[in-house]
């Protein structure tokens, strides 16, 4: 632990206690931006034997990076300064709340003595009220604490426990004097939530589920909450208990092995491929596991799921044909369903698959690029272990339709949908797992919002593949409204020159307009695993993927408005 001059600072402080707890929870890097109210605390991060500081270009990017890190590690931390810094990060923190990502937001604040004077301190609103931003945090975090010396340890443990259990951000206001206040190290590990399943609820759920299933084949639709709640093993056991056709929503893409013969594809309501839609909506018994239907992943709520034939497995409760059983945790409900399939002694026949079509030959090398061409070729370039981040535009919807190789992790942000998120999030993902190559897919307009972190990739010695889709502006917005409107235009950048300008010396950069040029660039990226590779892909303004075409239609197939 950091030790300083005993005359000026105690050997072990409240700040050290917080850092030790974060390290205990699996955090080894902390993102953020320095400010005068957090500088002394940052000294303790730098001196900590199990933690490393990763500074960012701005607080918004730091929040996005912490989000990307937290999705892979299960916990992350972000440090900003009071007022100006924390509000800059608020968009990212709100996104983590919406998408259930555990991020601890630590805000360095003025000393309690300075706050007590109620004077107009810098970074405040000048009215003597230093809790404005604490109150803001209540809307976008699951737990908050304004640390006081006497209760700091207990409050730190409370916030961290809530973040770990709820899988949402927490907020800790750490005043400069409280951060240096003396305390003792943790005596024991942070207590874990021991579970809240009612044996009676579990027994009744099992009985009802067994009656509904009978000898039917079940079909499973899974989504991201299975990942967030760390119930993937229980879900995989259910899929292995019989021949179980299964699909995911776009939000849960890569949750399951998409190379499995039983994997149906992506379900998106009326925007689904017809075979996927039929398999899900006409299943004799459908198990929905961790499913949250949002507008952009459900074809604007066009799903047609019959509750009478559905077993819905949620975070703390499950239902069978509309009858709710609670409290019942997801993992235990999935285990009960697995036991039902195992005990009944009925094996379902193999899933009928359409005959495999021979792969079409690659397009002519001189052919101008299309969206489909780009995502087809990107998918063939992926290898097990890759972490793919697709920004909320043509990149996300272009990739959603494609099956990923086994062992590839896919990250998007379809609920919060903050464009530019994925570039700093890719940094966080790469820091979380530097042994897994990160592949970033992002539009030109989105990249302009957060591109500063290219320099941080270089400083951290990371070697992502970055595909920038240059379609001359906000193509998704053009597809929705304002095809030729000036507000959907952006200033064109010379993308192949951007890495140099941001301090990336060891890199490759390509500008591609034909299939042959794209093929050559991705082949070079595969050869050069030790450096950043940026590929600028030039596409027509109004070239959009099939799935996005379906989603932006003004009406559903039944004629009802989508928005």
From Swiss-Prot:
Which organism's genome codes for this protein? Mycolicibacterium paratuberculosis (strain ATCC BAA-968 / K-10)
Query: Where is the sequence biased in composition, kind Pro residues?
Result: 351-366
Q: What is this protein called?
A: Alpha-keto-acid decarboxylase
Q: Which cofactor does it need?
A: a metal cation; thiamine diphosphate
Record SUPFAM superfamilies = DHS-like NAD/FAD-binding domain (SSF52467), Thiamin diphosphate-binding fold (THDP-binding) (SSF52518)
Quote the cofactor binding remark: Binds 1 metal ion per subunit. Binds 1 thiamine pyrophosphate per subunit.
User: Where, in this chain's numbering, is thiamine diphosphate bound?
Assistant: 59
Q: Which family does it belong to?
A: Belongs to the TPP enzyme family.
**According to the UniProt record, where is the region Disordered?**
347-367
The record's section on InterPro entries has:
DHS-like_NAD/FAD-binding_dom, PDC/IPDC-like, THDP-binding, Thiamin_PyroP_enz_cen_dom, Thiamin_PyroP_enz_TPP-bd_dom, TPP-bd_CS, TPP_enzyme_TPP-bd, TPP_PDC_IPDC
- The lineage's top-level taxon is Bacteria
Q: Name one GO molecular function term.
A: magnesium ion binding
Query: What PANTHER family has UniProt attached to this entry?
Result: PYRUVATE DECARBOXYLASE, PYRUVATE DECARBOXYLASE ISOZYME 1-RELATED
| Residues binding Mg(2+) | 444, 471, 473
Q: Which PROSITE patterns does the UniProt entry name for this protein?
A: TPP_ENZYMES
Relate the protein's function as given in its record.
Answer: Decarboxylates branched-chain and aromatic alpha-keto acids to aldehydes.
Segments of this protein annotated with the region Thiamine pyrophosphate binding: 394-476
A GO cellular component entry from the record: cytosol
């Amino acid at each position: 632990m950091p030790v300083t001059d005993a005359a000026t600072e105690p050997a072990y402080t409240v700040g050290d206690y917080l850092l030790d707890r974060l390290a205990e929870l699996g955090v080894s890097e902390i993102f953020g931006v320095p400010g005068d109210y957090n500088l002394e605390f940052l000294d303790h991060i730098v001196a900590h034997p199990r933690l490393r500081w990763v500074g960012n270009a701005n607080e918004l990017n730091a929040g996005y990076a912490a989000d990307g890190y937290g999705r892979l590690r299960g916990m992350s931390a972000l440090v900003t300064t009071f007022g100006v810094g924390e509000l800059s990060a608020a968009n990212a923190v709100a996104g983590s709340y919406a998408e259930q990502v555990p991020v601890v937001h630590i805000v360095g604040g003025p000393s309690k003595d300075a706050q007590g004077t109620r004077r107009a301190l810098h970074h405040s609103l000048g009215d003597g009220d230093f809790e404005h931003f604490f109150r803001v945090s209540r809307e976008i975090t699951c737990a908050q604490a304004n640390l006081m010396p006497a209760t700091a340890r207990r409050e730190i443990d409370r916030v961290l426990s809530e973040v770990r259990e709820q899988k949402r951000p927490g907020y800790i206001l750490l005043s400069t004097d409280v951060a240096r206040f003396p305390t003792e190290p943790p005596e024991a590990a942070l207590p874990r939530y021991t579970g809240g399943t009612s044996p009676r609820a579990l027994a009744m759920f099992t009985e009802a589920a067994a009656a509904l299933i009978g000898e039917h084949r079940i079909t499973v639709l899974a989504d991201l909450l299975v990942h967030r709640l760390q119930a993937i093993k229980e879900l995989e056991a259910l899929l292995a208990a019989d021949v179980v056709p299964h699909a995911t929503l776009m939000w849960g893409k890569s949750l399951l092995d998409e190379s499995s013969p039983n994997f149906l594809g992506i379900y998106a309501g009326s925007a689904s491929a017809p075979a996927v839609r039929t398999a899900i909506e006409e299943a004799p018994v459908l198990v929905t596991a961790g499913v949250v239907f949002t507008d952009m992943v459900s074809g604007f709520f066009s799903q047609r799921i019959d509750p009478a034939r559905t077993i819905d497995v949620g975070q703390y409760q499950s239902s069978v044909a509309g009858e709710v059983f609670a409290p019942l945790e997801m993992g235990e409900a999935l285990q009960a369903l697995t036991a039902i399939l195992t005990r009944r002694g009925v094996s379902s026949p193999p899933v009928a698959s359409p005959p495999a079509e021979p792969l079409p030959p690659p397009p002519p090398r001189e052919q101008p690029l299309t969206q489909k061409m780009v995502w087809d070729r990107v998918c063939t370039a992926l290898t097990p272990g890759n972490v793919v981040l697709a920004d909320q535009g043509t990149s996300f919807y272009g990739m959603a339709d494609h099956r990923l190789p086994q062992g590839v992790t896919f990250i998007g942000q379809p609920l919060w949908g903050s464009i530019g998120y994925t570039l700093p999030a890719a940094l966080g993902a790469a820091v979380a797992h530097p042994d897994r190559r990160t592949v970033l897919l992002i539009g030109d307009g989105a990249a302009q919002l957060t591109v500063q972190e290219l320099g941080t990739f270089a400083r951290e010695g990371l070697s992502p593949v970055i595909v920038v889709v240059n379609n001359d502006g906000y193509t998704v917005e053009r597809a929705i409204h304002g095809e030729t409107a000036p507000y959907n235009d952006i200033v064109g950048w010379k993308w192949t020159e951007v890495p140099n300008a941001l301090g990336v010396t060891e890199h490759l950069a390509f500008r591609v307009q034909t299939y042959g040029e794209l093929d050559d660039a991705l082949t070079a990226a595969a050869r050069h695993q030790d450096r950043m590779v940026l590929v600028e892909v030039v596409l027509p303004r109004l070239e959009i993927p099939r799935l996005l075409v379906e989603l932006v239609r003004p009406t559903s197939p039944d004629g009802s408005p989508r928005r």
